[in-house]
Amino acid sequence: MNDKHAWWKPAVWLVYIVIVFEILFMISPIALYYYSAYAHFLNFLGRSPATAWLDQFFLPHFSQTSSPALAALGEIDEAIFFGGVALFLVGFVQIYFTKLFRRGQPVTGLLYRWIRHPQYLAVTIIGIGVMLHWPRFLVLAGYVTMLFLYYFLARHEERRCLARYGVSYQDYLGRTGMFFPRSWFGWAPSWLPERGAARALAVVAAYGLLVGAAVAGGFWLQDYSLRHVANYATQDLAVLSPAQLDTARLEHAVQMALADPAVAQQMAAHGYGLSDNEFLAYVVPMDWRLPDLPMEAQPTGGHYTPRDFDPNRLKVLFTRVQVYGYDAADGLDIVKRGVKRQPIALVKVDLGNHLVLGWETPPATVRWGDVPTPYF
């Protein structure tokens, strides 16, 4: 049967692969080639206050958190992802086994005995796992869009099957759920008008409400996450630590670094202390490596964050931040509204001996070039 809507599947998958699986490209050998194109799109979003927030992250990516709930999410992302992959593969094998050995028959056994679209449910679960690991607002919006398109794709497939198999498929519809077993939720009527302008308006309204609700939830999670990451802020300087360091230690490290004459001169040359300039500093254990931050040059390797670090030996990365919006940002709003970080100085301090061990000018960009990476 010819299907004029057959382009939906590759189109939906393209959105999913390019946007939602950014993290998988980032850690692969093709990362530089991928970002040679994708980074331009992310930077384009950052040029307008209307879209710059899409580059932001709404959950911690490399920072430890004092919230047990957030910490748990960081531990289960891989389990969710691989659970979804396993479910997808079971459905895949079942479909193609039926195509090979039971030609012309619909798939109604095993997973399909309770759910009509287990593979779409699997993709939903995979997306949750990826989003927990790489929680960019753009990923969130793309994920909701993908779910919305898959719902209508599933409805379209059901109409085709109903036309092809008739009463037997109608009976199957009556005893199964679309994405979850029917017994979980009971019978639910269609929530959209059948056809015409009313249906089109309802679809647009439903999509807007879903994306709006997801984004609002994302901003709430971002605010909650920042409250549970080690931080303190002044009017023009926000300070974060990926480690769970107390506020007094953060302040001590930053003030000691700023008291060094050479560092103070470097900061002043970039406008520190002048009005309407925003700065963000990271206080990081000396031995930690975080490729998401423009610190030391790191040609290879991922995150290295040993728990048994010396809390007195720290490095402080000072950056000047470009924020989106038409007014100046202060406090933690510098983090929430940050678009670009310009590295200024990387200062190594020993709090125990009250020494500045040295400072250097950090790399201009992260390993992947001028691409928006997580702020916390």
Predicted regions and their residues:
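Conserved SAM-binding loop
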Residues: 114-121
